Amino acid sequence: MGAPLVALNDGNSIPQVGLGVWQTPPEDTERAVAAALAAGYRHVDTAAAYGNEEQTGRAIAQSGLDRSQVYLVTKLWNSEQGYDATLAAFEASVDRLGVDYLDLYLIHWPVPEKNLFVDTFRAFARLREDGRIRSIGVSNFEPEHLRVLIDSTGIVPAVNQIELHPLLPQRELRELHAQLGIATEAWSPLGQGSLLAHPTVTGVAESHGKTAAQALIRWHMQLGNIVIPKSVNPQRIESNFDVFDFELSEQDMASISSLEDASRLGPDPKTFNFTG
């Protein structure tokens, strides 16, 4: 069974569950992506900063699947923001991936100190007009960044990929996304593993005969989030995709949501200006 599709504001759609390859060493990436595609995944999320675009692309090319069957996402790194730099960085990414178009291209971080994300997004829009990108979006954008971007370009991003897990459910940002028509995508959806042994999560999982990771992925799905769990273990990759045959109850959802404590595992987008 394939992942459900989430409709985007530009008429395209994205598989709700994908494989993320953040912090996946290049030597492990090809094997992980191959295992995911064999398990039924049709959505792979990488980034220039991950250093594994080449291996991601090679696994897709060797999978036997047509390019059109795999939803491919990568991200522009902070040091490459700006109109002309973005156009060059895009060409470098698709060259490493061995493809001629992207399904979704994201600005990795707003980098407020540089204040180049508007010009960067204008370059994204040009690439979309040229048929090189199907959908354009952002990552780690806070409400103030989204408002500036939309007011300046007249374009609403299709996706905002943000840190999101039960400890940091991002309610206000998700509500804003819903108002604006932006799809919410979760990175570190399992809380970088910190929630897998939590008794609340394991209790919900056991009541459905599922793993803690499966329960957390299902929690995201029922909130409407796109979710990209990361793993290099083929069995876990397969298990993380076995989430379409059960449903959490309202009580299950509330129990997992009650774990919120505003814990942020990654940098704060308001102050993260790293470009190295």
Curated annotation (Swiss-Prot):
Source domain of life: Bacteria
Protein's UniProt name: Aldo-keto reductase Mjls_1919
Family listed: Belongs to the aldo/keto reductase family.
Signal peptide range in chain numbering: none
Active site: 50 (proton donor)
Keyword Cell membrane attached: no
Gene Ontology MF terms in the entry: aldo-keto reductase (NADPH) activity
Residues annotated for NADPH binding in this entry: 190, 228, 230-232, 236, 239-240
Leading EC class: oxidoreductase
Keywords: NADP, Oxidoreductase
Keyword Ribonucleoprotein (UniProt): no
Pfam families to which the protein is assigned, alphabetical: Aldo_ket_red (PF00248)
SUPFAM superfamilies with a match to the protein in the record: NAD(P)-linked oxidoreductase
EC assignment: 1.1.1.-
